[in-house]
A protein has these predicted regions:
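Beta-strand-loop-alpha-helix segment that lines the small-molecule cofactor/substrate pocket
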Residues: 1-43
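Aromatic/hydrophobic pocket-lining residues that form π-stacking "cages" and hydrophobic walls in ligand
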Residues: 23-25, 51, 241
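C-terminal capping/lid region of NAD(P)-dependent oxidoreductase domains
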Residues: 34, 244-256
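Short glycine/serine/threonine-enriched helix-capping/active-site loop
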Residues: 37-40, 66-69, 107, 135
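C-terminal glycine/acidic-rich active-site capping loop/insertion
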Residues: 41, 154-226, 251-255
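Rossmann-like NAD(P)H-binding beta-loop-alpha module
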Residues: 46-68
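Rossmann-like dinucleotide-binding domain that binds NAD(P)(H)
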Residues: 73-143, 149, 163, 230
Length: 256
């Protein structure tokens, strides 16, 4: 209604309850020349912005995987499953950090509350260049965990969002594969590298403040938002493919 009335919109995630609805909103905003921005709040935190900065700098090298654990006890909901509740956080972060488009997704889930809605799910998303993302989502955990590991060719990044001070740690650890000797001997030779660990400085500005500033700037400067409607639509497309995969017993589902 707001877009139809000619108003710019900052909308809570997910963008819509279906891909069709999301496509309509994005199309309407484009048609009317309005800002449609998604509340992907994590993308405006100092930690995630620092992760983006480190990735863009090339310090980590080639990215190999994104492994996220987002678990806690509850809150069980009557209208959505754990995927629609928790996955939008990680999917929006992935969309912000990873420039390549995801190819396909496979997922398995289980319901233990008798209402037919999954309260635990394991989601695997495949990208080009052999990059893979894995999400562990759970409403039935005795512990609250918010941890992500990004594995790469040069260094490794660990983000613990529950850590009050040192949320991000960079590990100078990895492997080296000796290709020439492997070809000669017909077997894999791997050496391991273990160096220093350092904690980068993170901007402590409140994420909601950064997001609102971005929204206002986009309106004034007539530019696309960092987490615009298109970003929200991409998250919806993965959510849809994830649900299809669960219904098909974990089959790979292409992401449209």
């Amino acid at each position: 209604i707001s877009l139809e009335s000619g108003k710019h919109v900052l909308i809570e995630k997910p963008l819509a309850s279906s891909v069709d609805e999301g496509e309509y909103l994005v199309s309407l905003a484009r048609e009317k020349g309005l800002q449609l921005m998604c509340d992907h709040t994590f993308c405006y935190t100092g930690a995630v912005r620092k992760m983006k900065e480190i990735i863009v700098s090339g310090e980590l090298g080639q990215l190999y995987y994104f492994d996220s654990v987002r678990i806690n006890l509850g809150l069980f909901q009557h209208d959505i499953n754990v995927i629609w509740d928790l996955a939008p956080h990680d999917l929006s972060i992935l969309d912000f950090l990873i420039e390549t488009k995801p190819i396909q997704v496979s997922a398995k889930g289980a319901c233990h509350a008798g209402n037919g809605l999954e309260n635990i799910a394991y989601v695997t998303i495949e990208y080009a260049d052999n990059f893979i993302a894995h999400l562990h989502l759970n409403w039935l955990s005795p512990l609250k965990v918010r941890k992500t590991i990004i594995g790469s060719s040069e260094k490794m990044l660990v983000w613990n969002d529950l850590e009050p001070a040192e949320k991000i740690k960079i590990y100078d650890k990895g492997i080296m594969v000796k290709d020439e000797e492997m070809e000669e001997r017909g077997r894999l030779l791997v050496s391991y590298r273990s160096g220093d660990i350092y904690v980068p400085h993170i901007d402590q500005t409140e994420a909601l403040s950064v997001m609102i500033t971005e929204f206002a700037s986009c309106i004034k400067e007539d530019r696309q938002a960092l987490t615009d409607g298109e970003a929200g639509l991409r998250v919806l497309q993965i959510l849809k493919a994830t649900e299809q995969s669960i219904k098909n017993d974990g089959a790979n589902v292409p992401i449209q």
